[in-house]
A protein has these predicted regions:
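Glycine/proline-enriched, intrinsically flexible loops and inter-domain linkers
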Residues: 2-3, 7-245
């Protein structure tokens, strides 16, 4: 790492960028205690641990909880995994076999496939770039072609040795104004990556992950839902795939 500028193996498990401002000394004490208590306890797939939770929640947390949400957390932020029919049933039973979540997730998949469904996107990272030279800078650090204003592209971000360091959705709001959506868990690592490569003048960068919230809607009736909640023309001819407003 010191000689070649990047590690030759995956060292994410030892990277301090795994933690953000949610990882206070008190939180570290609680989680360390929890892990020590479980040192001889079997860990199951999809199992979530209860201590040190609710560091960050969104405006929809209480409403989702009342609707039977089962929660996990990523980078300190609570995010809904699936919904039970009743709040008292909102829990997972750890197992190596098919879990009780299966029927609930199947119901959600069927709803999105045949109708419309939504999911919070607060746990996606949002990186904002503004100012003269923003397009040139992003063209330099990203491997894919940047979109035109009002459009979205998906592009990888590579290291100097061609290794994948990020898979980002790039939204061009204006010619020199971009928002990059990426992994919430990697937001601190990506912030570090961007800031080390920013030019001295022109381009301003900010991590807006905690500032922007939203809901993604999908399904064959998603445009019908959009028509009910906005005055804009959201027909396929006016609001195309990969458009952004």
């Amino acid at each position: 790492w010191m000689i070649e500028g990047e590690p030759s193996i995956d060292v994410w498990a030892m990277d301090v960028a795994r933690f953000g401002d949610f990882a206070t000394p008190g939180w570290g004490t609680i989680k360390s205690s929890e892990n020590y208590e479980r040192r001889f306890v079997m860990t199951f797939p999809n199992e979530t641990l209860p201590k040190g939770r609710r560091q960050k929640t969104t405006a929809l947390f209480d409403r989702f909880t009342s609707k039977g949400a089962v929660w996990d957390q990523g980078f300190g932020l609570e995010n809904a995994l699936w919904f039970a029919e009743r709040p008292e049933d909102a829990h997972e039973d750890p197992t190596f076999h098919r879990s009780r979540a299966h029927k609930y997730v199947a119901r959600e998949v069927k709803a999105v496939r045949e109708n419309v469904g939504g999911i919070e996107i607060a746990n996606y990272a949002k990186h904002e770039f503004k100012g003269p030279g923003s397009r040139e800078f992003l063209n330099y650090i990203l491997a894919g072609r940047l979109p035109r204003p009002g459009r979205i592209n998906l592009t990888p971000m590579l290291t100097s040795k061609g290794k994948l360091y990020g898979d980002l959705t790039v939204a061009c709001m204006e010619d020199e104004y971009f928002i990059l959506f990426g992994s919430g868990l990697m937001q601190e690592a990506h912030r570090r990556w961007f800031e080390k490569r920013l030019p001295e003048k022109g381009v301003s960068y900010a991590n807006r992950s905690d500032d922007y919230h939203g809901v993604a809607i999908s399904g064959p009736k998603s445009r019908e839902l959009l028509k009910r909640i906005t005055r804009d023309d959201v027909t396929s001819g006016s609001f195309r795939f990969r458009d952004i407003r």
